[in-house]
C-alpha cells in the first residue's frame, strides 16, 4: 500500500509560489537599496557582501564566503580577486589548512567597509520602511523565527550560526554616534 503524503500537491505549489513571489519582491527592493547604498564606494553587492563576511569572520576561506554569501565558489573567488586588486583584501594559505585559500581585510578594506556602515541611512531602505508600521503597532520589528527555521533546513545550522554570529558582532561591536554607526574600538569595549 502506498504511503500517503501529509501535504497535498496543491498546498505545496501554493506555498512555493507565495514564497517565491514574496522573496523575489523583497529581494528586488533590497537589491536596489543595497546598490544605491554602496555605489558611492565603487562596490557592487557581491564585493560588499565579501567585505562584510570577511569582517565578521575576521578572515574567511573562499569556501566560507561562497557558503555564507550564498554564491558560487567561482563568484566568491573572482570578486575577492577584484577586491585584492584594489588593495582591500589579501589572499593566503593557513598553516593548518593548505588546501583552502583564505582572504583577510587589509586596513584599507576594513576602513572602507566601516565607511559603508557609517553611510547607511535607514530612510533609504524600503524594506525597513515597510516594517516600521509593524514596529509602531507592536513595539518591535517582525521576528524571523519561521524564516530562520526554513533557512536552517535548506542551508544547515552552520549558515544560521554564522548569521547569528554576524548579528551579535554587529550588536556588540558598533555604537550609534551622531546618527552614524561606528565600530567600537577595543578600549571602548572594555569599559562598556
From Swiss-Prot:
MF GO annotations: DNA binding; DNA-binding transcription factor activity
InterPro entries xrefs: HTH_MarR-typ, HTH_tscrpt_reg_Hpr, MarR/SlyA-like, Tscrpt_reg_MarR-type_CS, WH-like_DNA-bd_sf, WH_DNA-bd_sf
Superkingdom to which the source organism belongs: Bacteria
Pfam families with a match to the protein in the record: MarR
Database matches in PROSITE patterns: HTH_MARR_1 (PS01117), HTH_MARR_2 (PS50995)
Record-level GO BP terms: negative regulation of DNA-templated transcription; response to stress; sporulation resulting in formation of a cellular spore
Domain called HTH marR-type: residue spans: 12-156
UniProtKB keywords: DNA-binding, Repressor, Sporulation, Transcription, Transcription regulation
HAMAP family: HTH_type_Hpr
Name this polypeptide is given: HTH-type transcriptional regulator Hpr
Amino acid at each position: 500500500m502506498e504511503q500517503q503524503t501529509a501535504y497535498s500537491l496543491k498546498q505545496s505549489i501554493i506555498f512555493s509560489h507565495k514564497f517565491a513571489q514574496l522573496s523575489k519582491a523583497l529581494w528586488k527592493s533590497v537589491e536596489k537599496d543595497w546598490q544605491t547604498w554602496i555605489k558611492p564606494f565603487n562596490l557592487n553587492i557581491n564585493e560588499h557582501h565579501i567585505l562584510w563576511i570577511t569582517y565578521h569572520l575576521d578572515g574567511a576561506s573562499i569556501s566560507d564566503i561562497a557558503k555564507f554569501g550564498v554564491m558560487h565558489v567561482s563568484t566568491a573567488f573572482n570578486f575577492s580577486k577584484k577586491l585584492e586588486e584594489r588593495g582591500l583584501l589579501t589572499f593566503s594559505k593557513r598553516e593548518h589548512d593548505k588546501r583552502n585559500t583564505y582572504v583577510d581585510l587589509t586596513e584599507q578594506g576594513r576602513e572602507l567597509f566601516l565607511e559603508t556602515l557609517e553611510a547607511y541611512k535607514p530612510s533609504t531602505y524600503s524594506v525597513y520602511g515597510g516594517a516600521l508600521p509593524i514596529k509602531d503597532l507592536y513595539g518591535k520589528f517582525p521576528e524571523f523565527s519561521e524564516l530562520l527555521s526554513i533557512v536552517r533546513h535548506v542551508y544547515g545550522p552552520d549558515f544560521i550560526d554564522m548569521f547569528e554570529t554576524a548579528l551579535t558582532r554587529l550588536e556588540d561591536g558598533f555604537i550609534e554616534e551622531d546618527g552614524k554607526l561606528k565600530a567600537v574600538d577595543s578600549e571602548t569595549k572594555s569599559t562598556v
